[in-house]
Design a protein with these regions (language model features):
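Bacterial N-terminal signal peptides
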Residues: 1-11
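N-terminal non-cleavable signal-anchor helices
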Residues: 4, 53, 78-81, 381, ...
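Generic marker of residues within folded, mature protein domains
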Residues: 7, 45, 67, 123, ...
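Sec/Tat signal peptide C-region and signal peptidase I cleavage site
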Residues: 13-17
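Beta-strand-centric surfaces of beta-sandwich/beta-rich domains
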Residues: 18-207, 212-326
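Extracytoplasmic copper-binding redox domains, predominantly the cupredoxin/blue-copper superfamily
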Residues: 326-420
Length: 420
């Protein structure tokens, strides 16, 4: 099928209209035992002009066989078009914390919920054969041995026909970052919720004709509203209960998020203020979470169109409570009343710490690789960015036992901070 599709794509420009399925793969990605691989690489793209009408991704071994989620988890992948400006970001910060030297447009993403792109008939995401695609990835290896895999992506590609062009619109609680995380404190009590939101003003009129969303463990819903007329546009709800990878290296996310694909879509007008709200359970901490919605926008006049919304498909479900264990017991003497520790490669300098309530504690990053400080369990949720140099501070205002780890090296780097 792949060979036939490629031959069709290489046909002369006068060829009949066709929609072909193209299967492509990333370069090999090696992940250490119980490790996390993050990075950015250039990937292949269709070699002739056309339109992407659908897209999906998965993880395969070097022989092309699908890899189970319980073995290597596709935590998330983002496909970008290099040298194209993004609709909501003027600059993009990579995993290294540095701004991208080139503009990139985020046009498709997939996480644990395995969202696939499917545009309505008559619409397409324009692509030139000369366009450059990139892949931003985060994969997790749940086995005690190194593994090498590829990200496989399947593109349905229309050529030889004129489709209405769509523009990807990425909305995010922490926009313009490769790792757009925040943490839920978990201090609200039983049945409580925690919400963050972000606003974006539309620079032009048109309609959203497709969209999907990405939440992490503890998520309740992502809701898009148009504050200019006060109405709801789309609510994406999670489904829980998938296969549980072991060991549990992070709080499991939903196995599905509701999406929409419809024409003529959801009309919005130039100057409208869109608000994306991410709602999480606040009865327990949830760290390194995200709140993202990617929409596909068809610009044009919406005169005469009334506001509309995607019907709700249910109500938010309370996510299952998952207590994240420490995968390595912290070692060494108990360090009392200290205010800082070094974080080197694969080790916290002081792994067992006891401090009085109200202490502001500092982690100093001094390794050759990136690491972070993330709460596994404890009274209040927090997490640092991934850092190679610099420091991170947290003020401990609630007594209790804080079990901490590095989310990039969860079986190697752990720490317990007891707050008196």
């Amino acid at each position: 099928m792949l060979v036939a599709a490629l031959l069709t794509l290489c046909a002369p420009s006068g060829a009949l209209a066709a929609v072909n399925t193209i299967v492509l793969q990333s370069s090999p990605i090696t992940i250490g035992p119980f490790g996390v691989a993050r990075g950015i690489q250039r990937v292949d793209s269709p070699s002739v002009d056309g339109n992407v009408v659908s897209m999906s991704a998965d993880v395969v071994d070097l022989a092309g066989n699908p890899v189970p989620n319980a073995h290597v988890m596709l935590h998330h992948v983002v496909f970008v078009k290099v040298l194209h400006p993004d609709y909501t970001c003027s600059t993009f910060t990579g995993y290294d914390g540095l701004p991208s030297p080139l503009p990139v447009e985020r046009f498709y993403a997939e996480g644990e919920e395995h969202m696939s792109l499917g545009l309505p008939n008559g619409y397409g995401y324009p692509n030139k054969g000369s366009d450059i695609w990139g892949l931003v990835y985060m994969l997790m290896n749940h086995h005690n041995s190194a593994d090498t895999v590829r990200v496989r992506y399947t593109v349905r590609y229309a050529t030889g026909e004129s489709l209405r062009p769509v523009t990807p619109v990425w909305l995010d609680m922490r926009n313009c970052q490769a790792d757009p995380i925040f943490s839920v404190p978990g201090t609200g009590g039983s049945g409580s919720s925690y919400e963050q939101h972000t606003d974006f003003t539309m620079p032009e009129s048109g309609s959203f004709i497709a969209g999907g969303a990405h939440l992490h463990g503890g998520g309740l819903q992502l809701e898009l509203t148009d504050r200019s007329w006060g109405g709801r546009l789309f609510t994406s709800l999670p489904t829980w209960g998938g296969e549980m990878p072991t060991p549990m290296m992070h709080e499991p996310g939903p196995v599905q998020m509701t999406t929409f694909s419809t024409a003529p879509g959801l009309p919005v007008r130039r100057g409208d203020t869109l608000r994306l709200s991410a709602q999480y359970d606040n009865s327990a901490p949830h760290t390194r979470v995200m709140g993202i919605m990617i929409l596909y926008f068809s610009p044009g006049s919406v005169d005469g169109l009334s506001p509309s919304s995607i019907p709700l498909t249910g109500a938010p479900q309370r996510p299952p409570y998952m207590r994240l264990p420490l995968l390595r017991r912290p070692r060494g003497p108990l360090a009392r009343n200290i205010r800082s520790t070094a974080v080197g490669d694969y080790v916290f300098g002081n792994q067992r710490v006891s401090i009085p309530r109200g202490t502001t504690f500092t982690w100093r990053f001094v390794g050759a690789e990136q690491h972070d400080v993330t709460l596994a369990s404890g009274p209040v949720g927090f997490a640092s960015p991934s850092l190679q140099r610099g420091s991170y501070r947290h003020r401990f205002t609630r007594p209790g036992t804080y079990r901490l780890f590095c989310s990039l090296h969860p079986t190697l780097m752990t720490q317990i901070v007891t707050v008196r």
